[in-house]
Amino acid sequence: MSEKKKSAAGILTLLVLCCVLGGCKAGIPVAGTDITRVTVILPHFDDGYWMLIGEGIEQSGEKIKKNCGMDIKILKPQLNYNIPQMVELLKQQIAAKVDVLVVQGNEDEEYIDTLKEAWSEGIQIICVDTDIKNFPEHLYIGTDNYEAGKMLGEELINVTDGEANVAVISGEPGFSNLEERLEGLQDAVKDYPKIHLGDVQYDNYDGLTVMKMYYQNAKDADTIVFLEGTGGVTISSQFRQRDAQYEHILGFDAFYGVISGAIDGIIKQDTRRMGEQVVEEIANYIRNGEYSSETVYTTTHWMTAENY
């Protein structure tokens, strides 16, 4: 073998060895020579949910990111949960030819069509927090929302002794995670005829609307259930102890209200872990050409003042 060929073979062997030792898939060059560009579009930066997902992504596995050549950018719309603005951000990232898009799923037609365009151009799609039903091959990372709703229903039965008139407040129509939670809640209480669930009302993720519904529903309901975090967070900020309007208040993620006693209990989602697993699963794809699973569920648990 000529000296030139020996040199080329040695370089190739060294590159493959570096990839293996660095945790990257053969064929993905070491960090600095080729970058997997990831754009995360979060619908909102808040203090108790999306911010924690963002922190999980930003703070997770710097060694993994470096070894696998991963560059992650986090964006959000100017207005919280503004779908047209998120669609525009998606289009910009498609034009920029990023490798991976991490998004919250929803059922808006233009939003889904834009994601399908990205998918058709070879961009990997990861849904976090909320999945998209019947979407082409993609990854979902987040809560098993049906089971979370069922857990909420079971705890509703426990705290009310199976008898309550319940106001049900959700975020906004068109989000499968909230619909699945509602389904789980309904299934959990269906054999308890003395638990009456009212029609679902939507606060549109707005604290003022939450408070308006809170007082309006107190006329007919003795219990209020929030299917996502806005309601509980709002109640937590308004009341430092239990308010006399309701006998029981249950929700998601608002742990400050649980600590103060303003809320009976919450379903606590592992939001930071959602963010961490985004990074870990992208690394899996870089190394192995596939994710560990099509669906990666994070844990949930029932939190009260007693077990906080």
Where are each of the predicted segments found?
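Short beta-strand elements in bilobed, periplasmic/extracellular small-molecule ligand-binding domains
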Residues: 63-79, 165-168, 189-205
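Bacterial N-terminal signal peptides that target proteins for export
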Residues: 2-11
